[in-house]
């Protein structure tokens, strides 16, 4: 079953794949990394001007990494928001996805956290660096193949 946004994207020949609907009836779409930036701009102009959240996860050990965007469009009133979930999958070896910081400023810390925990590089992000882990940390702690170090250095908070 194709949702309203998926039908609109198909009508305008914008490449995507419908992944169905979640339990709340929110449409989920898959976008290729190379198409993500242009489609993100189109979605913003179309009215999806609120990035509710961005997160990332490791699909499977040795598999793809996913960056997930929850977008909201309020056209008919705040009590009737139109929402969509966008998933962008990237290869584990060199996970690169265009940053949407310049479209939705709220992506700033969220993309940095995804970089810090999973190692996804968000191209053209102005401050892409670790946000939770120390700069000297080696590895990506939320990857399923991450091996935790045997010790942790306690640092003075002063």
From Swiss-Prot:
A single GO molecular function term of this UniProt record: quinone binding
Entry keyword annotation includes Cell inner membrane: no
Keywords attached to this entry: Chloroplast, Membrane, NAD, NADP, Plastid, Plastoquinone, Quinone, Thylakoid, Translocase, Transport
Principal localisation: plastid
Top EC category: translocase
Cellular localization per UniProt: Plastid, Chloroplast thylakoid membrane
Catalyses which reaction(s): a plastoquinone + NADH + (n+1) H(+)(in) = a plastoquinol + NAD(+) + n H(+)(out); a plastoquinone + NADPH + (n+1) H(+)(in) = a plastoquinol + NADP(+) + n H(+)(out)
Family matches, as InterPro entries: NADH_DH_suC, NADH_quin_OxRdtase_su_C/D-like, NADH_UbQ_OxRdtase_30kDa_su, NADH_UbQ_OxRdtase_CS
Xref: Gene3D superfamilies: NADH:ubiquinone oxidoreductase, 30kDa subunit
Gene Ontology biological process terms, A to Z: photosynthesis, light reaction
Topology with respect to the bilayer: Peripheral membrane protein
Cellular component, GO, one term: chloroplast thylakoid membrane
Enzyme Commission number, as recorded: 7.1.1.-
Subunit structure: NDH is composed of at least 16 different subunits, 5 of which are encoded in the nucleus.
Family label: Belongs to the complex I 30 kDa subunit family.
Known role: NDH shuttles electrons from NAD(P)H:plastoquinone, via FMN and iron-sulfur (Fe-S) centers, to quinones in the photosynthetic chain and possibly in a chloroplast respiratory chain. The immediate electron acceptor for the enzyme in this species is believed to be plastoquinone. Couples the redox reaction to proton translocation, and thus conserves the redox energy in a proton gradient.
Record protein name field: NAD(P)H-quinone oxidoreductase subunit J, chloroplastic
Provenance organism: Ranunculus macranthus
